[in-house]
From Swiss-Prot:
One of its GO terms (cellular component) is cytosol. Its main location: cytoplasm. The lineage of its organism: Bacteria, Bacillati, Bacillota, Clostridia, Eubacteriales. It holds the Pfam family Transcrip_reg. NCBIfam families: PRK00110.1, PRK12378.1, YebC/PmpR family DNA-binding transcriptional regulator. It comes from Clostridium botulinum (strain Langeland / NCTC 10281 / Type F). It is found in: Cytoplasm. This is Probable transcriptional regulatory protein CLI_3132. Belongs to the TACO1 family.
Amino acid sequence: MSGHSKWHNIQAKKGKVDAKRGKIFTKIGKEIVVAVKQGGPSADSNPRLRDVIAKAKANNMPNDTIERSIKKASGELNAVDYETITYEGYGPAGIAVLVDVLTDNKNRSAGNVRYAFTKQGGNMGSTGCVSFMFQSKGQIVIEKKDGLDEDELMMMALDAGAEDFESEDEVYVVTTSQEDFGTVREALEAEGLEFLEAEIKMVPDTYTAIDEDTATKFQKMLDVLEDDDDVQNVYHNAEFPEGWEE
């Protein structure tokens, strides 16, 4: 099946800061704190926590770091209260952008996000200005390896309830509805599969091709956003030029 995940295209352009493991761990740690505060410290009874732990393990986050974040959120250690906010706006050339933040100071976060937009010729918009262009989907990314049969994996995913299966350069991308994400992930885990990524994200209905000049400006915007500790996720509908490198 052919989908429209563009996972490899987007992943390659997410920003060099995502290679800094410590920053990734800080952001996931915040997600764990919020998940525990909302649904309790047991992954068995807290689906959101279970999903965040799966994301943490996919990013090679040490178990003791995961446990420390859970203890912090459950009151065994001092914890900060975070607020979840999604900002919307347009990047250069009208690229639709969603920015998820977890913050203890929304004025600081709003200012930082607005600066990132305007610095590269974009602008932060009002709630709802671009979110209608995206859908909440589960996305499971599996590395291509010897012995992993594409047809078998596709049937396994579809039988478990996946909506789409796509083969990209180095990975397979399984897309699910938000509701079926946990079921599909658990079915694939039961088959012994390991994931590069497994999480709920906002997927654009369509992608917009951008030229190299716009790609350079937009990458700078992404770098600024993703270097902000409050920013958890950045979603967009840009399709970078084939073979483009910053």
